Amino acid sequence: MILEQYGITNFFKEQKIAATSSYGRVTAVFRDYYRVITENEEFLASLKRGNFYELSSTSLPTVGDFVEISGDLQILSVLERKTVFSRMNKDSAEQLIAANFDYALIVMSLNHDFNLNRLERYLTVAWDSGATPIIILTKADLVEDLSFYAQQLKAVAYGVPAYYVDNLSHHGFEALESDLKPNSTLILLGSSGVGKSSFINSLAGTNLMKTAGIREDDSKGKHTTTHREMHLLSNGWIVIDTPGMREFGVGFNQAGLETTFSDVEELAEGCRFHDCSHTQEPNCAVQAALEDGTLTMQHYENWLKLQREMAYHARKNSPALARQERDRWKVIQKSMRTHFKTRPKK
């Protein structure tokens, strides 16, 4: 019964474990230990080292994972995941953040934190995770006219539900809560100080999280969440909070990028050449859309930037691609410089 409240489904219960083991869910990750809840208790567990010695870091448990627990409180294995969110660190290694969530809530505040390029980056990793993305715009009480932001969102996140909320008055939460499925697991993504902790408190109906805020002078956030942790709310939702991430590297799974930039991908299907770089080739549908204003330069440049970032991480993990990708991007960058110099000003 307890694990059902914490989101276990037949997908996980049908994965076989030893008769002497039990199912558990990781609710927090610390340096050397994992906080795990089972049907009977919540405790700090360690890894059975022999079982994880030769596995990659992505095979280690993360918040939200369902795991096999031994009688002596050791994690024996990680069950197959339904969804997973990871980011690339500075060494181009994949770093797990959380697993097995139904919704990825991208939280941005309606001040200087509102950034379309960052939103597209978050949407890319959200789609790539396998979860359903939802945009949460906090501090809506500070904005008189929301139509400006609605138009901005329509340009880069068409079809993704967006909710304008005020954590103080609770405005906007009723619509959001009616659309979330009961007993769902939610992960919150966003920069420091955008109101993620206050949002959790509003969703929970109690002061569950410590809050800080954004400095008024520069709109920079202050960290209140220092580690990844799961919270079971009294209304049945399970929330995974993460430390604020203003910048993070995307991985090299093309699916999330194709979904976020589906408009550009659809345009690219109309190009004359199947291997079009969308920078200099004749009869390029993407360049034509740039010329007639159908596609904005900002959206296009962010698409190219994320494409290149994914290619970089792919090269780091597959050295054989390095020379091929380097030569290709030399051509693209040269043609982009030529395009920007010769493009008539409007």
Question: For the regions a protein language model found, what residue spans apply to each?
Answer:
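Helix-rich effector regions associated with P-loop NTPase G domains
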Residues: S56-F66, G71-D72, E80, S86-Y103, ...
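N-terminal accessory targeting/assembly segments
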Residues: M1-L116
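Conserved Walker B
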Residues: L110-N111, K139-A140, T242-M245
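Structural beta-sheet core signal
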Residues: I106, I135-L137
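Histidine-anchored nucleotide/phosphate-binding helix
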Residues: N117-D128
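Canonical P-loop GTPase G-domain recognition
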Residues: T132, K139-V194
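A conserved segment at the C-terminal end of the G1
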Residues: K196-A212
